[in-house]
Amino acid sequence: MDVSLDGKVALVTGAGPNIGSGIALALSRYGAKVACNDLVPDAAKAAVRRIERNGGIGLALSGDVSVEADVLANIAAVLEAWGRIDIVVNNAAWLHTNHILEEDLASFNRAITIAVNGNFLFTKHAAVAMIERDIRGSIVSILSSNAWQGASGFIAYATHKGGLANFVRAAAMDLAPYGIRVNSFTPAAPRPDNPELLARWRAEGRTELRPPRPPRPDRPSWWRETGTYDVRGNIPMGEPATPTDIGHCIAWLSSDYARLITGCDFVVDGGARAKYWAYTPDADAAAGPVPLIPLDATELADG
């Protein structure tokens, strides 16, 4: 099976520098032209540089996904540049962490507005563009493990991610008569693999798989004592996914091979979500890392 997105145009929101950038690169490596949206213009430009460095074609877009005028301007820019939109990945969100007893309404509303309005606006207006051009497109919303399970300190994030899980199912039903598929993807603490991001972290003296968290005396010991955590011990396959792993899956989900898949959620997490909560994987029995099919030429050069 040779997955190809040749001739297709994709738009990825929240395109930098971690999950969004990885998805954008993957769609490009599988043949799509990719428009990269981010609230921070430099982040969108960095995602496009990564695409172009690997031989792809990208377009940098800046805009607030929760503002309808910005969304319409982004879609118009893609249509003007390439004449069509086949794929949309709704990745933009605000990872705002706070305890329910500490959260304020303004911050709660902001987190909800960015994620929910952003998914609604891009899904609606991209679908209109697809229908007008008789395109049977693919729309993917990026969720989180917090959509399905509770974690202390993520009240706003869990609320909007959980809500989006059902938004996807409802949107899938609305758009099915037009041949437009709507699905979701649930990351689970992915390990960053963007060479530019990792280089910046090294320059800042970071050595962990994930960036340090601020000290919080009210949080569990793994947070309180080190400010970081390592999730590998809770993953049955012993290794967290990367944005590259996520990108491979979303590229396939956006291809014609997935033509009848809609209203579904996909997860690439080494078995983390399927794991019984009390089960701790035996690290000594782990088979070891499965070889990764890389997408970034810089990663190939470094390896």
Where are the predicted features?
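Substrate-binding pocket helix/loop in short-chain dehydrogenase/reductase
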Residues: 99-100, 104-112, 231
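Residue(s) in the substrate-gating loop at a strand-loop-helix junction
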Residues: 144
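Active-site helix of classical SDR
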Residues: 123, 160, 168
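C-terminal substrate-recognition "lid" of short-chain dehydrogenase/reductases
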Residues: 4, 120, 181, 237-268, ...
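Alpha-helical segment proximal to the catalytic Tyr-Lys
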Residues: 128, 132, 173-177, 259
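Canonical Rossmann dinucleotide-binding motif of NAD(H)/NADP(H)-dependent dehydrogenases/reductases
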Residues: 3-35
